[in-house]
Amino acid sequence: MKLIYHPVFLEHDTGMHPENPKRLEAFEGLPATEVPDGTPWLGLVHTEKHIENVKAACAAHRHLDPDTVASPGSYEAAVRAVGATILASETDDFALVRPPGHHAYPGRSSGFCLFNNVAIAAQKLANEGKRVFLFDFDGHLGDGTSHIFEDTDQVLYCSIHQYPAFPGHGWVDEIGRGKGKGFTMNVPIPPESGDDIFMDAVQTCLQVLEQYQPDVVAVSAGFDAHLHDLLLQLRVTEGSFYKIGNLLRERSPNIFATLEGGYNVEVLPKCVHNFLAGINGKEMLYNENETTSFRAVWEEYELRVNSVMGNLRSWWKFS
């Protein structure tokens, strides 16, 4: 797995917003990859009205919602982010893109996200008859992605995220509906959770991955669960992202990823490169002292994860 990057992603001008070009500028010396224009695939997930609204907002340099900035360069960056994620899905690579995507709904932008990059790529794969395990370890629920796939069993959405936190849902009882019931898995971890809880949640998710037997694993790779990130109260270190990569490599030959959150520009490159090292079977590049969670946090987590497993036992086995 290698990084797919293009300087067009820096043209999404958000000023002093936490999601700003410095996030990718922190990755020094990256070669530019030719990435396709994602416009032909937007309609796999998004309404025509939404696509036109994003285009108009970018041209007018206005916000799409209170948290989501648009600038004249944002539309081109956003459609290329979609294209880069499609390319990553074809080559088993990591799309290092912005704007991110997992909060975007079919009909609206949300939470720094214009179009839902990973959902579009996953829907394209599903349309080709593939089963997709969509693993979202960003510290926020990918509520747009969850909504998009809540009524299908062809894409299993699994999220580990801080709760309570934005967007305010992603609780243990949100397991999908209709044909998709049992194919949405939320593992909401408490604030102050450390590496121990985070990796326990990962192992719980991987039990379902093994049973689902997907053709492809799609990863919403957000790194805002890190101890020193700006927007959450989780205490995960760089080593956990290496472990996730390693565990996924052992379970699937077909994995691609796209960047979601991660707002500390000093640690984001380390987290991403650790994840890549794990996926590629290389040695860990960066290692911090692992964090452990206080007993009260563990007790709250255990109540939650037991509820997660209880709600999904009709579909999946847990050890």
What are these regions (language model features)?
Residues 1-319:
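HDAC/HDAC-like amidohydrolase catalytic core signature
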